[in-house]
């Protein structure tokens, strides 16, 4: 068991000497442990608890109702236990995904952009709680990215220039209790996005893999280098002990790409516990139309179109979902040509 480093974010990041020093410390923590914690204040804690409570209430609803909270326009909505697959094996959490909530009158929705549409909210309380929680997470995400840029001695807005009107989204998860035949909640993988900020209840079950000297890490954004299932049964894995009044933060694939591997996307997995477990994973992301580039080689040719990357990842994860079928039916991938 490792005691994770915990940091307090300033209310505003302005590029001061203290900001630069904190940015360097964040980078060093990720490079050493793969994950860090940030302190949360009373308002953030209240919104975290309200989101968790809304999730618990939703998960008590009948499966027929939960399964109706889907859309063929967006990947927002309900995912049943076992519907999601990692490395060929089913994952067992119930999930409600919250992507950008766009009305059908939005020009991008009317134009048939892939993944764009309204969230199929189960009720107003759930909608209000999740949006308020994501608002707090988004503010923290912007500060973290500014500090990271300063820590690398880059212009303060290097990363946040890409996250203007970002495709921020969240996975709201419920893990069932373990059984004699089911102990893995989610298999080992890295996350496809820029920065992951997560909250969990007091049950526990998350494990992360820290950077290991000399270990080759796949570039999960490339078709032939999936990280799904890698190192599943190979030490070391760090158990992320539930701690009150913190959020955990780790880099995703896009940040690994942009920093030329100076920050690695953190592999993680979830083991089921003896009780049900609730968690939220928020992804602070680039704009759907943004192109990520390598910040230490800005003149290079390598680019990742974020929207195409996101769409590809979700289509791969949910090949039979009505959203994926609609993308194929309407040839919505033509948007990226």
From Swiss-Prot:
Cofactor: Fe(2+)
Domain Fe2OG dioxygenase: 166-286
GO biological process assignments: ethylene biosynthetic process
Highest taxon of source: Bacteria
Entry keyword set: Dioxygenase, Ethylene biosynthesis, Iron, Metal-binding, Oxidoreductase, Plasmid
Chain sites annotated for binding Fe cation: 189, 268
UniProt KW Coiled coil keyword: no
Record-linked InterPro entries: DIOX_N, IPNS-like_FE2OG_OXY, IPNS-like_sf, Iron_ascorbate_oxido_reductase, Oxoglu/Fe-dep_dioxygenase_dom
Keyword Disulfide bond: no
Pathway the protein takes part in: Alkene biosynthesis; ethylene biosynthesis via 2-oxoglutarate
Any one Gene Ontology molecular-function term assigned to this protein's record: metal ion binding
A Pfam family that the UniProt record links to this protein: 2OG-FeII_Oxy
Enzyme Commission no: 1.13.12.19, 1.14.20.7
Uppermost EC category: oxidoreductase
Catalytic activity, as annotated: 2-oxoglutarate + O2 + 2 H(+) = ethene + 3 CO2 + H2O; L-arginine + 2-oxoglutarate + O2 = guanidine + L-glutamate 5-semialdehyde + succinate + CO2
Any further remark recorded for this protein: A dual-circuit mechanism has been proposed in P.syringae pv phaseolicola for the complete reaction, in which the binding of L-arginine and 2-oxoglutarate in a Schiff-base structure generates a common intermediate for the two reactions.
Reported function: Simultaneously catalyzes two reactions, namely formation of ethylene and of succinate from 2-oxoglutarate.
Family: Belongs to the iron/ascorbate-dependent oxidoreductase family.
Complexes and interactors: Monomer.
Protein name: 2-oxoglutarate-dependent ethylene/succinate-forming enzyme
Organism: Pseudomonas syringae pv. pisi
Encoding gene (name): efe
């Amino acid at each position: 068991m490792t005691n994770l480093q915990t940091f307090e974010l300033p209310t505003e990041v302005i590029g001061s000497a203290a900001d630069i020093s904190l940015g360097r410390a964040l980078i060093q923590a990720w490079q050493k442990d793969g994950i860090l914690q940030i302190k949360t204040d009373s308002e953030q804690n209240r919104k975290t608890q309200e989101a968790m409570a809304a999730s618990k209430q939703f998960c008590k609803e009948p499966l027929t109702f939960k399964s109706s909270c889907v859309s063929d326009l967006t990947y927002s909505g309900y995912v049943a236990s076992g519907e999601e697959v990692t490395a060929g094996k089913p994952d067992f959490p119930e999930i409600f995904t919250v992507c950008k909530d766009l009305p059908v009158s939005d020009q991008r929705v009317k134009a048939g952009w892939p993944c764009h549409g309204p969230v199929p909210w189960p009720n107003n309380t759930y909608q209000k709680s999740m949006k308020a929680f994501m608002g707090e997470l988004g503010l923290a995400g912007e500060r973290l990215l500014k500090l990271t840029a300063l820590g690398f001695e880059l212009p303060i807005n290097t990363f946040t220039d890409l996250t203007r009107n970002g495709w921020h989204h969240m996975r709201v998860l419920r893990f069932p209790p373990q059984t004699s035949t089911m102990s893995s909640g989610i298999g080992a993988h890295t996350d496809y996005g820029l920065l992951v900020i997560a909250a969990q209840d007091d049950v526990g079950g998350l494990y992360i893999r820290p950077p290991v000297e000399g270990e080759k890490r796949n570039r999960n954004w490339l078709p032939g280098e999936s990280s799904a299932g890698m190192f599943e049964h190979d030490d070391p894995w760090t158990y992320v002990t539930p701690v009150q009044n913190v959020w955990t933060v780790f880099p995703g694939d896009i940040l690994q790409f942009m920093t030329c591997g100076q920050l690695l996307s953190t592999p993680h997995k979830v083991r089921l516990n003896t009780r049900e477990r609730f968690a939220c994973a928020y992804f602070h992301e680039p704009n759907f139309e943004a192109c990520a580039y390598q910040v230490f080689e800005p003149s290079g040719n390598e680019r990742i179109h974020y929207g195409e990357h996101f769409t590809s990842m979700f289509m791969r994860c949910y090949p039979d979902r009505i959203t994926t079928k609609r993308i194929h039916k309407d040839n919505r991938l033509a948007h990226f040509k």
